[in-house]
Amino acid sequence: MSSSSSSLAAAAARKRALTEQRFSELSPALSPEVVKALKGGGFRRCTPVQAAAIPLLLSHKDVAVDAATGSGKTLAFVVPVVEILRRRPSPPKPHEVLGIIISPTRELSSQIYNVAQPFFATLKGVSSMLLVGGFDIKAELKKLEEEGANILVGTPGKLFDVMERLDTLNYKNLEILILDEADRLLDLGFQKQITSIISKLPKLRRTGLFSATQTEAVKELAKAGLRNPVRVEVKTEVKPTGKDGAQQELGPSKTPLGLRLEYMICEASNKSSQLVDFLVQNNGKKIMVYFATCACVDYWAIVLPLLDSLKGSPIIPYHGKMKQGPREKALASFSALSSGILVCTDVAARGLDIPHVDLIVQYDPPQDPNVFIHRAGRTARYDQEGDAIVFLLPKEDTYVEFLKRRGVPLTERECSTNAVDIVPQIRSAALEDRNVMEKGLTAFVSFVRAYKEHHCSYIFSWKDLEIGRLGMEYGLLQIPSMPEVKHHSLSLEGFTPVKDVDVTKIKYKDKAREKQRQKTLKRKAEELALRPEIEKRRKAPEKPEKPKRKKTGKQRQAVQTKEDMDELANEYRLLKKLKRGVIDEDEYEKLTGFGESDDDDSSDGGDSDLDERKERGNKVLKKIKQKGKAKGSRRFEGRSKQKTRRR
């Protein structure tokens, strides 16, 4: 992937990645113990971000650091934390928390904790604890309650939980708070937890906010959590190498020095074949391949090892839906390899410091364009060189110009003319194993739906997706029935379905799974056969209606009396309104029915009828009052009897 001229450029970049400033020459000076620990880890000279941030934090300043991924941010805050705690006049009490480091993911928190251990070990009488998800919270709370901790490293969710549940830890004398990958913390929705954590800490502290991108949300967080912060912005001047080996002046770049970025444009039906050819060309390297979804990772993690050209290559899946144990094991396994392939999602895009990664492949461009830089930054870290490539469809070519305008220049790489078509091999595997077929369908559907949610929808328009060619890329036997295909005129051009195949008869290679599937199919068939009988039972014959019994004379009289009383009560209410002047006599007549008559001459008797109605209303009033008095007297008598009984 690199020529002799590009190798020379990368070598020059490695030299520029470090400053001439040595850790031993920083001012304020570092302690001999920390300098020794740095030398033990192979760190003698500072990166630009370390040279800028460490002295500021040690000089009682708050800092907001904006630096490219892979620039050495971790040591830029671990060293100040250790030095600040070392300078305290007396050793801390067991439950006195003096330093907190917050990062967005379990993996990043664990990585920071492991990097910091040699430095924490130089502090006498100071204990530390890692607080991340996936572990028994009760056991952690018990340990904290019994032993305490002076430095806490963890994720915001877990730290918030601990602070809410446990009141034995003392934060009043906290010296320093670090927020690492601040933009990612906010993207993941931790704003509420971070605000709550900060509210429980003393204002007279030092705070470091470290981020690869300065978003508006990060700036707002800096205003809320930092006091007069010093802004540290570290950018690198990059001169990427073109096809002819000449260097192009492009000014400041957000990518690490020593990183070569390329892109390849190919049809969807040829994309998976180009990927495999590219992996074969770079056999023996340590490679990370990024996919859009967890389902895509699961699918390609089982398909790639089945291909003839990649048999024997270690291929490890890694995504956010894996359980904590397998995730940690996968990461540890890949980190220990000298060569191999990690197929992953964006959960591995930030913060992870995997050693000696040679090549980054972005098979699916990220939904968020900011993540592009973080993915590429897994290689070319510190003083190393590395390569990264992104695969694009023909209609996505404007993404190249978009990245260039954001300070991420790319050079084109032509499609290989020798790439072997892998679709027949994938389809053959799907016909032999139902697991491959099902995972392919799930991955295909998940990719289409993820594509719909792309932040750059004007470049990655899902309505322009060529579903037919995409189906060939995934080696599908048939295009699945899904709303995106059913209700929209997406192109099925380029797809050749496998004929004369009954997909319901494809079996699992795993005998136990197939046995369970057959049991399920048998049970469903039995349920289907019984359904008509069940439906028949449900539709029981309707019971004949009981003949209605005639009401007795008393019942009829009671109904009539109630109706009369209701009518009289209504008239009385209207009469009261008339007396108060709420309504006039015409309205009263209309509402009581006196204004309605078929004969014009009937109006002559209106006055006498009105007087009669008023008299009836007064009688109703008298009856209602009498009833009220009777009820009141009965209540009084009841209370008197109760008092008599008590006596």
From Swiss-Prot:
InterPro entries assigned: DEAD/DEAH_box_helicase_dom, DEAD_box_RNA_helicase, Helicase_ATP-bd, Helicase_C-like, P-loop_NTPase, RNA-helicase_DEAD-box_CS, RNA_helicase_DEAD_Q_motif, SPB4-like_CTE
Composition bias type Acidic residues, residue spans: 596-610
Coiled-coil regions listed in the entry: 507-582
UniProt biased composition (Basic residues): 619-633
Biased composition (Basic and acidic residues): 512-545
Annotated ranges, domain Helicase ATP-binding: 54-232
Post-translational modification comment from the UniProt entry: Phosphorylated.
Cellular component annotations (GO), alphabetically ordered: nucleolus
Keyword Chaperone tagged: no
Signal sequence interval, chain numbering: none
UniProt domain Helicase C-terminal: residue ranges: 274-430
GO molecular function terms noted in the UniProt entry: ATP binding; ATP hydrolysis activity; RNA binding; RNA helicase activity
The keyword rRNA-binding appears for this protein: no
Enzyme class: hydrolase
Catalytic activity: ATP + H2O = ADP + phosphate + H(+)
Similarity remark: Belongs to the DEAD box helicase family. DDX55/SPB4 subfamily.
The protein, known as: DEAD-box ATP-dependent RNA helicase 18
The organism of origin for this protein: Oryza sativa subsp. japonica
Species lineage: Eukaryota, Viridiplantae, Streptophyta, Embryophyta, Tracheophyta
